[in-house]
Regions:
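Short charge-dense sequence patches
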Residues: 4-16, 40-41, 75-83, 98-108, ...
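Amphipathic, well-ordered alpha-helical segments in soluble domains
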Residues: 10, 31-34, 38, 64, ...
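Long, charged all-alpha helical bundle/coiled-coil segments in cytosolic proteins
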Residues: 57-113
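Long, charge-patterned amphipathic alpha-helical coiled-coil/hairpin "stalk" segments used as oligomerization
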Residues: 95-140, 144-149
């Protein structure tokens, strides 16, 4: 058996790390899609007034986010990738919209486990989701609720 040269050992080590990173990236992409899907379904349930279902979907998204964040701790380049942060933003948006519609306190970034930038983007997008709620309340002639939202 031939012993690899120092350069060969270094190259093998790099290849193993890159392969691990690629696998982690693939898992993060898939999990990010699932989180985004759950968050979108939570927002839809919120619009339909199905707050218990919205909460259930949101909880599942948040649980997946916790697991994903733990898995990505050793891979900051993947954690900070746009597709991971976008998934976190979508989950935060669903949580913010649900909180406002359900008359609950507005959750903070730390409550949701998201970075500040993702939270601020979620806050802006939740405002556009609330536009639909306002229009629905206006159609129902519920001016007080529309004004509140």
């Amino acid at each position: 058996m031939v012993t690899p040269s120092p350069a060969g050992r270094i190259a093998e080590s790099i290849v193993r790390r890159v392969e691990g990173l690629a696998g982690t990236r693939d898992r993060a992409l898939g999990e990010g899609r699932q989180i985004t899907r759950l968050a979108a379904n939570s927002v839809r349930a919120t619009h339909r007034g199905e707050l218990a279902e919205a909460e259930r979907l949101l909880t599942e998204a948040q649980n997946r986010m916790i697991v994903l964040k733990a898995e990505l701790r050793p891979y900051p380049s993947v954690y900070w990738a746009g597709y991971v942060q976008d998934a976190m933003k979508e989950a935060a948006e669903a949580a913010i919209a649900l909180a406002i519609v359900a008359d609950r306190p507005l959750p903070e970034p730390a409550d949701l486990g998201v970075e500040d930038a993702a939270y601020l983007n979620a806050l802006a997008e939740a405002a556009s989701e609330l536009r639909r709620q306002v229009l629905d309340r206006l159609r129902e002639n519920d001016l007080a609720r529309a004004e509140y939202l």
